[in-house]
Design a protein with these regions (language model features):
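Core nucleotide-handling region used for phosphoryl-transfer chemistry
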Residues: 7-321
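A signal for long, low-complexity, Ser/Thr/Asn-enriched, surface-exposed stalk/shaft
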Residues: 1-4
Length: 321
């Protein structure tokens, strides 16, 4: 009953032009249920309070029941009087092909493919502007992590990045990057520290802005490469299945209601190298390592919802940890 009432509340209050964008009060409500995977972390910068939101080990049902698709790295900056200065979006949660009901092949095969981009293998990055005009780079949940420090360093030393970021913040657009560096290796190697532009989002409506409409502003900033034109999902699946030395692709489609819908296609090469679908995921020491390294969400994302036994086993270990 509590969840049903919450869903009614969300449906009445969150939807903005097709995107469910939480206000601060609504984000707090998502965290208040005792079974909620969502949580808030608070910090302070130059006397301004900041709240980050995220989720711990959320399953598909949590995103559906709470409408929590926007809670990953959602950030609020407050004025000194306690009022909200601005809310900063990140990327909404999306899934792998065939991972959850909404990303099943039988559903998305009928969607129009708009763009296919290379999936970079680093850490998500964005920027926040404070009431005093200060701009800081951030990782998903921090201004102080090694990744956040690197993100801010690129902003301060790369004039093209700074120019683009400043323009987006002045126009209430969120520029979302992938931070890659030799010292930030996940699986793939990157030879230098840089920010690769992934997306531009309207910070008020959540709408994804076509990068190709703003190439003059993007300038020489590196963009996650656009793949060849793909109109046929079957062909794209065949191509990705044969690729090596890359993580995969992000597919941006248009659903039957005209709304942007994203899903991921990972290469078998990357999955095998990352050990995501090997027997290792059933070994307690391996699972504990993923939990401690904050990689378990990626692991869970590779296990289909139908693999109930695997999910249950991992969840039991998570609760112990």
């Amino acid at each position: 009953m509590k969840v049903l009432k919450y869903i009614e509340f969300v449906n009445e209050n969150l939807e903005v032009k097709g995107y469910r964008l939480p206000t601060y009060d609504q984000a707090i409500k998502m965290c208040s249920d005792e079974d909620s995977p969502f949580y808030e972390i608070k910090t302070e910068v130059d006397g301004y309070n900041v709240s980050f939101f995220n989720y711990r080990l959320a399953q598909y049902k949590d995103f559906v029941n709470y409408n929590g698709y926007e809670m990953r790295g959602l950030t609020f900056v407050f004025n000194t009087d306690g009022s909200v200065f601005n809310r900063y979006l990140l990327l909404e949660k999306f899934f792998n092909l065939n991972q959850v009901p909404e990303s099943m092949y039988s559903i998305v095969k009928n969607y129009k493919i708009k763009y296919v981009n290379n999936k970079e293998d680093g850490s998500i990055a964005s920027f926040v502007k404070f009431p005093n005009g200060k701009v800081l780079g951030k990782s998903k949940m921090s201004f102080e992590s090694d990744q956040a420090i690197g993100i801010d360093r690129v902003y301060k030393t790369n004039s093209d990045i700074k120019k683009l970021v400043d323009w987006t913040l002045d126009n209430d657009i969120v520029a979302i990057f992938e931070y890659v560096a030799p010292q930030n290796r996940i699986v793939l190697r990157y030879s230098k520290e840089e920010l690769i532009l992934l997306r531009l989002r309207d910070n008020k409506t959540g709408k994804h802005i076509d990068l190709k409409d703003h190439l003059d502003k993007i300038g020489s900033v590196k963009i996650a490469p656009f793949e060849d034109e793909y109109n046929d999902l079957d062909h794209l699946i065949e191509v990705v299945a044969k690729q090596e030395d890359k993580e995969g692709v992000i597919v941006q489609t248009e659903d039957v209601n005209g709304r942007d819908f994203f899903f991921k296609l990972k290469t078998p090469w990357y999955v095998a190298l990352h050990g995501l679908l090997t027997d290792d995921i059933y070994k307690e020491n391996i699972i504990i390592g993923y939990i401690l390294d904050d990689k378990i969400d990626d692991i869970l994302g590779q296990i289909p919802e139908t693999e109930v036994e695997a999910h249950d086993r991992i969840e039991k270990i998570i609760k112990i940890i």
